[in-house]
Amino acid sequence: MDDNIEIKREDQTSHALVPDKDRKSRIQHGGKRPIDPFAAEDDDEEEERGDAVDEQDQDDDEDDDEDDDDDDDDEDDDEDDEEDDTARGQRRRAKKQRRNRFLDVEAEVDDDEEDLDEEEEELAREDGFIEEDIPDDTEDVQRRAAADNQRLDRFRRQEEDTNAEALAEELRQRYGRSARYAAQSDYAEVPQRLLMPSVEDPSLWGVPCKPGRERDIVMTLVRKAMAENFTSSPMRIISAFCRDSIPGRVYVEARRADDVVKACNGLAGAYARQTTSLHLIPISEMADLLKLQKVQNEIQVGGWVRIKRGKYAGDLAQVLDVSENGEEVGLKMIPRIDLNPKDSGLYTDSLGRKRKKGAGSSATTVAFRPPQRFFNPEEVQKAYPRDTPTKRGSQWVFQNDSYRDGYLEKDVRVTGIITENVNPTLDEITKFAGESSIEDGINKLGAVDLSLIADASKKATEALIQPKDQVEIFEGEQAGVYGTVKAINNEVITIQLEHEDLMDQIVEVPARSVRKRFKPGDHIKVMSGKHADETGLVVKVEDNVTTFLSDLSMQEVSVFSKDIRQAAEVGSGVNVISGYELHNLVQLDAQTVGIIFNIERESFKVLDQTGQVVTVKPHQISTKKDTSRAFALDHDGNEIRAGDMVKEVAGPFSRLRQGQVLHIYQSMVVFLHNREYTENGGVFIARARSLEPLAPKSVSTKTKKDGGDLSKMNPALSNLSGGGANDVRVEGVRRFGGRDMHKGKNVAIIKGPYKTYRGRITETTGNMARIELTSVSKPITVSLDWLVEKDPITGRSTKLNAGGFGGPSRGGHSGTGSRMGGASSNPYSSGSTSMGAGGRYNPYGGSQPAAAVGSYGGSSGTGAGGYGGYSQPVATSAAGASGYGGTGGIGARTPAYNPYAGDGGKTPAYNPYGDGGKTPAYNPLGDGGKTPAYNAAADGGRTPGYNPYAGDGW
């Protein structure tokens, strides 16, 4: 059909029926519909409407057979019309057919449509799409059901409206305030400004405390405040906190400083005894104390870190890998395995003695941890027979730890490692290069990325670079260019280039791209590290490692270039520790002595008399030995002393070693030094009998050496003396003539700032003396005029004379005679030779600083003398008096001695004319320097001595 048929009912508007397939769908979905309570008013009316619908449906079926080829646009129009009809509340009902309540009569559908599956059918049944069986009840029941449905729908609509209003009100109350602030944010201040402290807020006080106890003090304050909160006198503090970056300080918030002092009273480690010990934090700095700025340290594979705690605390480790979440890192370190499990309850102290661990000690603490040692499965298996290591591929597993190539590989959390200021030393780096010694590991440092070390110690490197340093750019576009540092601004360094093509140009480069530059022949000084303050000559430069020849030990030392700088002076390094110097002979124990050949920061390298090298601490040394007067006999029977150049002529090193004598021990062992030998700092030992001088001693050499001995020029002494024996004696006296006679005296200070202090003279220089005080253990330097000698037993004070060898006594001056031990017979002689102790007393020339020898100028001597001594002959300890004073030299001696024989220098032979310098020989002409020799003519300087002509005050 080409024309549309309009059917208009009384209760609805006009509706166009389209003769297409849409009508079938309407019949399908309208076959059974839910009961409409408003449409059940009149049965007849419903039947009439149903008949009209049926008739119309039959007409539509006929139209469908004829118009199967109509366009789809008509179908869309019909759907719109259907929606309009539904919106107006118009419903069509099919003619009600009689149904049996016990039979399930399905709706009649087209064959073209697919059957609904069970799930869709159930869903449609729940939605009311398929009408269920309705019992044939009365109309009242249906009307009541319809009314109930209406009320239920009305109640649901009211409930939905109410819930929406309540929800809107709740949201308005919750977010209304922030919305107002958000609306005002364009013209109002930042809200965070309201949280800043002001003068009306409580003050913040800094409390000093013991470093390391900050957290304990804060927790104690919190517990104390909670305990006293409900008492009659609660703590009046508001808060307490500490910062890990500020050690030794705890911050307490309170209104008054007295409240802080009261709160901290009784806390161990808190130093808040009074308000003056507190520090008031300014208001502008209060907020900064609560800011937390997390520093992200990027951990690079191959970098260096240190362990924070546990058995490996402080040990250097190399990063192998980093986990994906960045919380754990794989480390490579040198293991610490206890190979003495039986001694697990013991530890070794600094003296090498075993001690028991305390009750609270642990085997993993730093004090009792085993030493670093590379993993050796054989040694571990011997130490732990029940817990042997197992091999898995290239790894060894022992006690749940993995070991590869002798190193321990372990996963550690990032919080347990130190990534800043690691500063690995060259000794530690060489161990990770695959060798345990520095000499062998230096050549393999190529396996270690030393640039990572520079990155790890970046701040230290920048601090060590100073203006005028020679530097080199080693990375970037300008790599290989060098110059002089002109200025440093934070992390930027200004360099004046000295390159051939870029002479005098100024460039700025990052500090991390610059390193110090040295060339062979430069004289450098070590600024930090194990060899600090040591100087030397650069012999080799390889990347970041510089090798120099030490001025102190004459050995090659390798250090990082960042730790050294150029120096003009020749330093001695750490040459003195606790009073011990290089090449000192020290006593280690009752049977062992040794010579120091290397000085480290806190220890010495000592070569003992058996040839063994030991490392000792200063407190392990008993004393320092003085061998300046020691001598020994060489291979030919000649004397050798310290300073002689000798060579070995016997033994395994015959004709191979030579050197200078440093020390002689027990006249048998000789310590020698040769700068050409690198082993043990050039120090070695030898037997005295296996040595001989490099230049053999001849008669002419001896004569030339002893040419200054004036005793050989005296014909009387040379004719009457015994010869060679006296030569040795005279030489011995001359050797002892230059000693410091004040050294070792107990003195008291009578002037100056140290008045009344007592001490002991250690050395004198001119008129100044160096005193070691006994009360404060402090060395000072004072004048000899400010000192008096104190008797340590009686406490008697004696004036200390600056000249001569002894202190003055009553009536004369003390001292020796001539330098050869004999006294001059000239009564008017006023002094001795320049080699003697000083001049003699001359009655016509005034007092002299040395002893007087002769008849006049009374010296306080004891012997009898016709001119200067007693007139009464007195027999002293050896002989009687002669007619002219002095001893006759023969009295009461056994056996008898020829007074004119040439017995000079012999003992017990006594010659009155040739006994000068002998002890206890007595010679009236040469006893000036003998003790207890008594000579009336040469008794000056003896105490007690009495001379009636010397004005001795008695």
Swiss-Prot record:
Q: What is this protein called?
A: Transcription elongation factor SPT5
Q: Which UniProt keywords apply?
A: mRNA processing, Nucleus, Repeat, Transcription
Question: Molecular function terms in GO for this entry?
Answer: chromatin-protein adaptor activity; mRNA binding; transcription elongation factor activity
Note down the stretches annotated as region Disordered: 1-125, 696-723, 797-834, 933-954
- State the organism named in the record: Mycosarcoma maydis (Corn smut fungus)
Q: Say yes or no: keyword Nucleus present.
A: yes
The beginning of the lineage is: Eukaryota, Fungi, Dikarya, Basidiomycota, Ustilaginomycotina
Q: Which cysteines are disulphide-bonded?
A: none
Q: Gene name on record?
A: SPT5
Where are stretches of biased composition, namely Basic residues? 89-100
